[in-house]
UniProtKB/Swiss-Prot annotation:
This is GDP-mannose transporter 1. The gene is VRG4. Pfam families: UAA. Belongs to the TPT transporter family. SLC35D subfamily. It comes from Saccharomyces cerevisiae (strain ATCC 204508 / S288c) (Baker's yeast). It is a multi-pass membrane protein. The keyword Lipoprotein does not apply. The lineage of its organism: Eukaryota, Fungi, Dikarya, Ascomycota, Saccharomycotina. Changing A286V: In VIG4-1; increases drug sensitivity and decreases protein glycolysis. Involved in the import of GDP-mannose from the cytoplasm into the Golgi lumen. Defective copy causes severe glycosylation defect and abnormal retention of soluble endoplasmic reticulum proteins. Involved in vanadate sensitivity.
């Protein structure tokens, strides 16, 4: 069992908060926005090329934070044991693949392009729920998915306009380099698949193992540590020169901040999946790209044009339609649960 220490055992005011769908969604939104922005900052630092190390720091911070909370009596979760570790290891492995491919995609792609494939993940997860959990997708929900994809396509057109304008201002050789294949598409395609598998399989394993939020957070991160370190030693450059370039004061500070942000996203992602559904979790993740797009205008010099702004409005419209569709579905099935 895992829980947050809340005081007396009688009526627990925190119980309603811990099982609140809207609060879990808002918490997940805030933490995931902070996580994405800090990750984008880290991977865009000059000469930074040790993504696995960055992700290792994040998981290490999460693990240490949980252990401290447990010592202080504010958190309870299952101790690491062989049976649970064996059952949960595939989830942690998928988590490593998901967060690594996400960091590589953010490194090479603009946020609007990144959003397109995240929206495709929503559809994969929605129909994955149909296959694995007996769920259903209404025509109204499908309409919201299509609108979300449309908002991403419109954002991409805006991004392409900006790229074309930039290429036109460059010399012919540089323009050719701009037009060359972007490896970010490969990373995004891989991230799309691993994200869908992670969310669907984690939800199933949570039901089978009866993991609570802190259990999920602890096992996700502590099992990811050796995987991340092994991958880093295998594929990343650990020479003294490269370590010096990667571990500057700016990069270390940014990695610590991103590690703190990962504490929130690690807890809130499991919390959101438990009290809502994996489709709602993924849709909220896609809606996060809207404020992230706005932060990109401020921090990351994202394209500023009519199409970029239009995509934001279409995205919010799709979110409203999705919320109404979910409400109608619940009203049509009042006796379930």
């Amino acid at each position: 069992m895992s829980e947050l220490k809340t005081g007396h055992a009688g009526h627990n005011p925190w119980a309603s908060v811990a099982n609140s769908g809207p609060i879990s969604i808002l918490s997940y939104c805030g933490s995931s926005i902070l996580m994405t922005v800090t990750n984008k900052f880290v991977v865009n630092l000059k000469d930074f090329n040790m993504n696995f190390v960055m992700l290792f720091v994040q998981s290490l911070v999460c693990t240490i934070t949980l252990i401290i909370l447990r010592i202080l009596g504010y958190a309870k979760f299952r101790s690491l044991n062989k049976t649970d570790a064996k059952n949960w290891f595939p989830i942690s492995f998928l988590l490593v693949l998901m967060i690594y491919t996400s960091s590589k995609a953010l490194q090479y792609l603009a946020v609007p392009i990144y959003t397109i494939f995240k929206n495709l993940t929503i559809i994969l997860i929605a129909y994955g729920e149909v296959l694995f959990f007996g769920g259903s997708v209404t025509s109204m929900e499908l309409s919201s998915f299509l609108l979300m994809v449309l908002s991403s396509v419109v954002a991409t057109w805006g991004d392409q306009q900006a790229v074309a304008a930039k290429a036109a201002s460059l010399a012919e050789g540089a323009a050719g380099a701009v037009a060359s294949f972007n490896p970010g598409y490969f990373w995004m395609f891989t991230n799309c698949i691993t994200s869908a598998l992670f969310v669907l399989i984690m939800r199933k394993r949570i039901k089978l193992t009866n993991f609570k939020d802190f259990d999920t957070m602890f096992y996700n991160n502590v099992l990811a540590l050796p995987i991340l370190l092994l991958f880093s030693f295998c594929v990343e450059d650990w020479s003294s020169v490269n370590l010096t370039n990667n571990f500057s004061n700016d990069s270390l500070t940014a990695m610590i901040i991103s590690g703190v942000a990962s504490v929130g996203i690690s807890y809130c992602s499991g919390w959101c999946v438990r009290v809502t559904s994996s489709t709602t979790y993924s849709m909220v993740g896609a809606l996060n790209k809207l404020p992230i797009a706005l932060s990109g205008l401020i921090f990351f010099d994202a394209p500023r044009n009519f199409l970029s702004i239009l995509s934001i409005f279409i995205g919010f419209l799709s979110g409203i339609i999705y919320a109404v569709a979910k409400q109608k579905k619940q009203q049509a099935q009042p006796l379930r649960k």
